[in-house]
């Protein structure tokens, strides 16, 4: 419970979502949260939300669709490969999210607002420059010219089309 509350307290735009297929667990967490003034405020502002899933599969789909910055999974036996979109994954009760915030070791510059769907946390890879280069041979030119001309025409881009057709 404190992990969800800790993330919700970052700022007024922060949202923590607790997902479980156990209504009893969610009810207990809601009651515990509601017992504190700050918890009441977080619930009122929808900064902490309790979501009941039909089963583990639905919970995993919801999590991957949401792509949280921090994902705490208490089930240590779950196949973590099922989780595909998150900033940082914390596995088991011992893995407090606050440890990752402060001192566990991995970089804490993480994707927010669902950006975990296409990006991971800051790493050395963000400092690489990827350059694209094309060198087309005569055979490739003929094939690509036809395809490019068709696509350019469909988009209504006349000069793209001409750029391709002069190479046929």
Language-model-detected regions and their locations in the chain:
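Short beta-strand-to-turn element immediately C-terminal to the catalytic PLP-Schiff-base lysine
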Residues: 18-21, 52-53, 91-92, 104
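A broad, low-specificity signal for short, low-complexity segments enriched in glycine/proline
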Residues: 11-12, 33, 51-53, 87-91, ...
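Acidic-enriched, low-complexity/disordered segments with a strong bias for Aspartate over Glutamate
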Residues: 3, 11-13, 27, 37, ...
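Glycine-rich, Lys/Arg-enriched anion-binding loops that position phosphate/diphosphate groups
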Residues: 36-75
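C-terminal core of ALDH-fold dehydrogenases
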Residues: 64-168
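Electropositive phosphate-/nucleotide-binding environments in soluble metabolic enzymes
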Residues: 1-2, 19, 23, 27, ...
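A conserved active-site cap/scaffold subdomain adjacent to cofactor or substrate pockets
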Residues: 1-50
